[in-house]
Each structure stands twice: as structure tokens, then as C-alpha cells.
Amino acid sequence: MRFEDYPAEPFRIKSVETVKMIDKAAREEVIKKAGYNTFLINSEDVYIDLLTDSGTNAMSDKQWGGLMQGDEAYAGSRNFFHLEETVKEIFGFKHIVPTHQGRGAENILSQIAIKPGQYVPGNMYFTTTRYHQERNGGIFKDIIRDEAHDATLNVPFKGDIDLNKLQKLIDEVGAENIAYVCLAVTVNLAGGQPVSMKNMKAVRELTKKHGIKVFYDATRCVENAYFIKEQEEGYQDKTIKEIVHEMFSYADGCTMSGKKDCLVNIGGFLCMNDEDLFLAAKEIVVVYEGMPSYGGLAGRDMEAMAIGLRESLQYEYIRHRILQVRYLGEKLKEAGVPILEPVGGHAVFLDARRFCPHIPQEEFPAQALAAAIYVECGVRTMERGIISAGRDVKTGENHKPKLETVRVTIPRRVYTYKHMDVVAEGIIKLYKHKEDIKPLEFVYEPKQLRFFTARFGIKK
């Protein structure tokens, strides 16, 4: 690792929050009380919080200034029109419906675009996305390239859709039985892996032949654009904004969690070009979120989201963002800690199968590892394996994903390289006595999205 490859933070810190580390004995009590679920730990008991990059970003001085310009009118807020103008300029879609966060957009899209029994092919599932699709009668079909399921394979653009898999599904079920293609840019559960522009264009060409719509999960689209600029031929001289605009020219719409690449703590939106879908979405947003001009958000939050979206396109910001994550991954890899490769956009994913080879998947190695990391060094991470995958809606059996990982997720503009050093040191220390990590079993298992609130105990 060459330290000159990693630039200093491209910002000055104007406001700080004091953090503390409680001692190891206290952390052991905290994790037991939380049922070995890191989601159930109080934030005050966490030293470095790498649970998620969703809503945990630091906002800029301009965004904080925008909060003071909130137009809190119930209808027709000027902040909505600023957000609408910004989204249309950057993404190029005709219509936008704001929502309180990404899953609000997923809920609306699933209701208006899926008929019971239709398939929704996509490049790997995401927890809330698949839940809304299945809740509305859809059948998710994974059509990501096979390489994405191999944690050890270091190849670019592991998020690409396998066009042969998509064509095979069309041939088997008929285009009329496919609601839309759900294309995530980047692919969270594959390790934050990007999708190439070549693949997006090819997916668009194939679906257009069959009259199938394509909706992107745009949550980390700016991170995806950086990888295209860095790794795909013909894009080195393009701006991030130009790349993002081209990406979405191959889509019919998108869902967006603004809590990631819009650099805010709350907010999201749904975009589309189709007028009928837009009218249907506006009818539903009134029921679940609020007026179509605020979608469950305060005006000030829409203003901050509009400003943050523009800030995320700055090359210096997104370069530092990607390289900070890569820095942590390289430190762990150099120490022999097994990680998912290549390092993606928003997190380093620990390969729990290789980290805890003594724990079978049915005894939740990733969940156990996340709990052990907290006890070891006060760092909160997240399970992304069999627990997150949930159960088959028909058989009730556990989904058994090939990737059993712990996501070490870096919030934007929050932590420094020194924080990454501390995280790496803690995980490396734990890896040296990994055989002490104990398998887990359910004490309480919720029926939906169980990873959020499930409780576990040491397996007897």
C-alpha cells in the first residue's frame, strides 16, 4: 500500500461530535442485551459506527444553510421545485415524486408496476426491494453475472447483468410476464460492485426489443459513475455528471434513497418518464407519504437533498469517498483478513465463510462475526448473509446466499483515515483469535426483514 495513493479529506471540519469507547466488559453486556444484533445496540455505546452509510452522512455548510431556507408550505413548496429541477437536470427523467426515503419509492413503484405473478429480474436482490416486490405479487429473479457470487474473484464490474440469463427468462415466461428489470447501480449485497456503461446500454437494447421497462436502483449511482470513469474505456475524460446522465438515459425511471449519494439524513424519490405511471404514483404517494410536492419530507430536507446531489458530483469528493473505502480494504487484505474482492463503493465486506470456517452457514457466521467485532473494538458493523436473505415466501426455508458477509460501511464525510486504521487494527486483532467466535441461534425471529429486529443467543 502506498499512502500517497490516498488523498487527504477534501473538506475542513467545522463541527464535531464527541465519541467514547466503553470498556470490553461493558461491550460484552451490551451485545448480550441487544440479542447479538448490532441493529439493537444504542448508538451511545458505539465507538465507530459503520453499521450503514444510509442517512449517516455529514452535511456541508451549504446544506446546513439550505435547511434555514425551508419553505414548509403544505403544497407547492419552492424547495420541491428546486429538487425537481436538480433531479431532471442530472438524471434526465420527466417526472419526480419525492418520498421519505428509498423504500417509500420502492413501495410505490412495486404497487404501480407489478401485477401478481409477474417476474422482476435484477442484478442480485436487496432486502427491502425484494420485500416490496414480493408483497405486491412479484417474483424476483437473480440475473447478475455468476462472478458476483464469488467473493474471491477480483474482476471489474461484477454488478453487470448476465444478458443470456435475461434473454432466457424472457424466452421462458414471455415479456408480458416481466414487470420490469430492476438494475442496481451499484449492487449493495454483491459488495458495492458497479455496473458498466456497456452493460447498461446492452440491457436497454435487449429490453427495448421486447417492450420491457428498466428501473434503476439509483441509491449509489455516483459511486457507480466513478468506477466507470476509473475503469471503463472511453470515460476517463468525462465528468461524473456527464457519466451519471448517460447512465440514466438507458432507464425508464429509478428509485432513489437520498440518504446515500444525496448526502442527507432523510429523503428519497421516484422518477419515471411514463405519464400513466406518474399519475398512478401521485395517487399512491398521497396515501402513504403526503402531497406529491413533499412526499413525507419537510421543505428544508428537500432543499438539503437538492444541494447534496450536486455536491456528490464533485470529482474531489467522490474520489476521496471511493479511495477511503479502498484504503480500509487494502489494510485488511495485507494482513490476511478475508474480504470480498474487489473492494466496492460504500463498504468493505468481510468474507465470514473464510473468517469463521468453524461456523456453518445455518449457525449464522456473519451475525456472530459482527457481534464479535463490536465486542473486540467497539466498531458497529452489519450482517449481510443468511439472516438478511430471509426465508422463501412459499416454502418458508431459509434462503442460502453464496455470499456470507459482514458489511463494514463507511459514512460519507464523517470519519478520517485514522479511524480506518483503528477499525483495521481491531478486525485484524480479532482475526488472530477467530476460533473464539461462537455460533448463534434465533431467540426471536420476525416474519419480515428479520435482520433489523431479530434476537440471538449463543448456540447450545
From Swiss-Prot:
Which EC number(s) does the record attach to this protein? 4.1.99.2
UniProt entry keywords in alphabetical sequence: Lyase, Pyridoxal phosphate
Tell me the Gene Ontology biological-process terms attached to this UniProt entry.
tyrosine metabolic process
Query: Its domain of life?
Result: Bacteria
Under the heading PROSITE patterns, the entry gives: BETA_ELIM_LYASE
Q: Which Pfam families match?
A: Beta_elim_lyase
Please give the cofactor(s) recorded in the UniProt entry for this protein.
pyridoxal 5'-phosphate
Task: Mark the residues carrying the PTM N6-(pyridoxal phosphate)lysine.
Answer: 260
Q: Name one GO molecular function term.
A: tyrosine phenol-lyase activity
State the top-level EC class.
Answer: lyase
The catalysed reaction is:
L-tyrosine + H2O = phenol + pyruvate + NH4(+)
What NCBIfam families does the entry give?
Answer: PRK13238.1, tyr_phenol_ly
HAMAP family recorded: Tyr_phenol_lyase (MF_00543)
| UniProt subunit comment | Homotetramer.
Name this polypeptide is given: Tyrosine phenol-lyase
- Which gene underlies this protein? tpl
